[in-house]
A protein has these predicted regions:
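Histidine-acidic metal/acid-base catalytic patches
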Residues: 1-17, 22-33, 48, 100-120, ...
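A generic structural signal for ordered alpha-helices
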Residues: 10, 32, 36, 77, ...
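N-terminal pre-domain/capping segments
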Residues: 1-106, 111-115, 137-154, 173, ...
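Generic enzyme active-site microenvironment
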Residues: 39, 197-199, 229, 297
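Active-site acidic/histidine proton-transfer and metal-coordination neighborhood
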Residues: 88-227
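Generic detector of well-ordered alpha-helical packing
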Residues: 42, 70, 200-201, 232, ...
């Protein structure tokens, strides 16, 4: 097998672009295979009624599964993506117990369909009163400024920094709870031979905060299944806001990264766009990708056409090869 074909065989498509269209999991995976993919990521919109067909399709060799996104399958009675419905940072012990239960269900499902990687969201800061985020959103609505100009706008920086100061204060106690929650599933993940990738998020109040993400992941033991999952779109959005340096994040986390969500960001800040149509420097990102060990997942908007999905596949392969 040539190197190029090996990279193509390992490139996965996330079901986030199509799971809402199907009532049969087998038909869904056949549709994705017919687009030219050998692997998929099962995202957080997989309802229970899709599971039997998915398992059968995997057993029949229709397609492979590179990764699974928590919670998958969805908790019983839920039919739309709800990756944050139970948070590992909650003030409610009952909610944390539900997070643990359904995360373990995801880990078991991942092993069942021969996937060794699970993507996790990891909660958020908590505010007794209204989240201060609304002040920043109001400022953005009132000021007609391009996303690419925000990080250099002094008025925006003042509003942003005031917000982040409050978020940082509100997150302090959440980190202890988050670490305990993740530690509570370490042994379970290890026993199922599954790695857990804590994803970088686009939300201002979601944890780990960008300033803390690297240090937080590195606080786990070297043999821990807790690792890092890099989302290119989320990182670029945070870079547009001046909250991180995209390249530096990749450098800091290169020895802890287990996978990538690959999608572009438009100049207006919309993510999950067709690769090559936005502002992300995929040539830079490709330097950090280990094509042999990293899970590589196209995570595209359900609004994109089949042709846009195929172009994204071709474009990212051009960068990777």
């Amino acid at each position: 097998m040539s190197h190029n074909s090996q990279v193509e065989d390992n490139l996965a498509l996330s079901t986030c672009c199509c799971s809402h269209k199907f009532e049969d999991g087998y038909a869904m995976l056949e549709w994705m295979a017919n687009l030219g993919f050998k692997k998929v990521e099962l995202s957080h919109g997989i309802s229970i009624n899709l599971v039997a067909g998915i398992i059968q399709a995997v057993e029949d060799g229709v397609i492979g599964v590179s990764s699974v996104h928590n919670f998958c399958p969805l908790p019983f009675g839920m039919n739309s993506p709800m990756p944050n419905i139970f948070q590992p940072t909650s003030r409610s012990q009952r909610e944390i117990s539900l997070w643990k239960r359904y995360t373990e269900e995801t880990i078991k499902f991942s092993q069942r369909i021969r996937s060794k990687k699970v993507v996790l969201h990891s909660g958020s800061a908590w505010f007794f009163f209204k989240s201060p985020l609304y002040k920043l959103m109001n400022w953005l609505e009132k000021n007609d400024i391009k996303e690419s100009e925000l990080k250099d706008n002094q008025d925006f920086i003042k509003v942003r920094d005031k917000l982040m100061l409050r978020v940082e204060r509100a997150s302090r106690r959440r980190y202890k709870i988050l670490k305990e929650s993740l530690q509570s599933i370490e042994a379970f993940a290890r026993n199922h031979s599954v790695q857990l990738g804590v994803e970088n998020r686009e939300g201002f109040t979601e944890l780990p905060l960008d300033a803390d993400h690297s240090e937080f992941i590195k606080s786990f033991d070297l043999d821990s299944p807790i690792s890092y999952w890099h989302d290119t779109g989320h990182a670029e959005i945070k870079a547009l806001y001046g909250l991180l340096d995209h390249e530096q994040r990749l450098e800091d986390m290169k020895s802890h990264t287990i996978g990538y969500h690959l999608h572009d960001v438009s100049d207006s800040g919309d993510d999950h766009q067709e690769i090559g149509t936005g502002v992300i420097d995929f040539s830079m990102i490709s330097r950090f990708i280990d094509k042999d060990t990293h899970a590589l997942v196209l995570e595209l908007s359900p609004k994109l056409s089949e042709d846009a999905i195929k172009r994204s596949k071709d474009n990212i392969l051009n960068y990777l090869n």
